[in-house]
Amino acid sequence: MQYLEKEEIKEIQLALLDYINETCKKHDIPYFLSYGTMLGAIRHKGMIPWDDDIDISLYREDYERLLKIIEEENHPRYKVLSYDTSSWYFHNFASILDTSTVIEDHVKYKRHDTSLFIDVFPIDRFTDLSIVDKSYKYVALRQLAYIKKSRAVHGDSKLKDFLRLCSWHALRFVNPRYFYKKIDQLVKNAATNTPQYEGGIGIGKEGMKEVFPVDTFKELILTEFEGRMLPVPKKYDQFLTQMYGDYMTPPSKEMQEWYSHSIKAYRKS
């Protein structure tokens, strides 16, 4: 296998993003750059220099349409990784892979090798805010069921580290996919025709930070991203401020190193 340098990884990810963008335009599926990718677009007009992720989000119905279309197109390189397509995958979002590549990321998780990817997040609409706290707890338990023992120790408090280690030992034989089902059921039960809120449920560990008034993400605009014009919510400032605070000020060098990922990527022979 051929080792991929950072710029080569970026080119492969952007080609994958171009494929997703063209697929969404072809099938009239609205999506937007999300999380750190949205931040990168607004602050850097491209990817955050010390980050190597690309994230997009769609409303749940569009999310399911996009995944179905990509699966049915059966592209020779680009494939869907989700709970339904993999026996080991446990996240409540999907990834689109470039299967001509392989990555290793064994720093945090007892995980399988996979491919360079773009994460695809569903946006759900709801009224019952209790699902946010419930899903947050399931996400925390799911993470403990899959991280390496060393990652359960944070060093923030002896008591908290002790409790996390106890939970880690209790959960190490639990399949993390169990928590996917719990979160998925929460989302389905919360579906309503008169929602007040929207956001990513069971996606990460931000809790109420990821909850916004309904239709926050409905209206999209185009912004520059790595020489392309790609969609972000018109209310991007509301999202970025709520998620990151003073988002136009880059973090310190130390924090940039903390945020950076430890992925080694290779092109298959």
Give, region by region, the residue ranges found by the protein language model.
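Conserved catalytic core of two-metal-ion nucleotidyltransferases
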Residues: M1-K25, I70-D128, Y146-G155, K160-M243, ...
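Short, conserved charged micro-motifs
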Residues: E64-K68
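Active-site nucleotide-donor binding segment shared across nucleotidyl transfer reactions
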Residues: N21-I54, L58, Y63, D215, ...
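Short, His- and charge-rich active-site/binding loops that engage polyanionic ligands
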Residues: Y138-V139
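A short secondary-structure junction signal
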Residues: L129-S135
